[in-house]
Amino acid sequence: CIRDRCPPQPLNDVTTVVFAGDHGIASNGVSAYPTDVSVQMASNIESGGAAVSVLAKRAGTSVRVIDVSLNSGSEADTHICDGSGSIDREDAMSRDEYRRALQVGIDAADREIDSGVDLLIAGDLGIGNTTPAAALIGALTNTEPVVVVGRGTGIDDNGWKRKTAAIRDAMYRVHNIHDEPASVLQFISSPDITAMVGFLAQAAVRRTPVILDGIVMCAAALVAEKLAPGAKQWWVAGHRSVEPAQKIALRELELTPVVDLGMRLGEGSGAVVTLMIVNAAVDIIRNMATFDEAGVSTAADAEDSGAEDSPAEAPGAEE
């Protein structure tokens, strides 16, 4: 039950936090869309026109976008840098950027939890972000690059080959430090994914449940669990993505997704769909009457009735 309460309390205050960032690796042609889509979609979410915005309205959750590393030139405190390094040949970020990004996520979790939320949803936004996510999962689970590569935004075969090469090269750069998750995170992820790690770990520290979204958030969860063992006890796997690396991460985390609808959008959209099911489950546990409370006959009643209807044995029938 949610937050160790049974029956669980209604989820009256839920916030979806979308961590946004651009990725240097996108210049390698690993996505079907141009990089300026990231900033445009962040604006679309905030104006209520994105899929997660529409779903959130139906599910009863607010949505907040945090620009961690979009190519936006933002001067906000949460903005670490414009984009990240191309992870196939350079570090995703400096050590200072890594620390600051981690703190952005920690602060975001604290802010929402201090405001009284019952549950959090974590989402992602950024063209090319499934590439560092797959590289992280591959590196931390010692899985071959070709096994973790998915189609992302719907790339063709040539795009898939470019993406495979990028992930292979990124994983090679950290092949000797698989047991150093913080360094792997700094070298082949991104500031926005690093912020997600801080967010997930801090939510667990604060004993606040989080519904995870797709491959990017599951990659962050994999790192967060390694940095803060036991954190996964506070997470729910929202849905199974079509990305193969997500399945590997969920298996490593021992989490079972609530739904499998073939979703691949990101933004936290799959997790918001799951929220509707979680809310339904809470209502069932809180409000559905038992057979006894409703005065409905049970199987035991049928057995008792059958015993009463059986004819009595005649005395002396057996000698």
Language-model-detected regions and their locations in the chain:
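Phosphate/pyrophosphate-binding betaalpha-module
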Residues: L120, T131-A195
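Active-site cofactor/substrate anionic-group-binding motifs, chiefly glycine-
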Residues: P10-G73
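Short glycine/serine/threonine-rich phosphate/pyrophosphate-binding segments
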Residues: A26-N28, A122, I127-A134, I193-V197, ...
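Internal helix-turn-beta structural module
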Residues: E243-D292
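Glycine-rich, mobile lid/loop segments that gate access to catalytic sites or pores
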Residues: C81-T130, A135-T141, G152-D156
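A glycine- and small-aliphatic-rich helix-loop capping segment at beta-alpha/alpha-beta transitions
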Residues: Y33-V39, A135-V147, L227-Q233, A280-A281
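Conserved small/polar residues in nucleotide/adenosyl-binding loops
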Residues: C1-D4
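Hydrophobic alpha-helical bundle architecture
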Residues: G198-A237, T256-M263
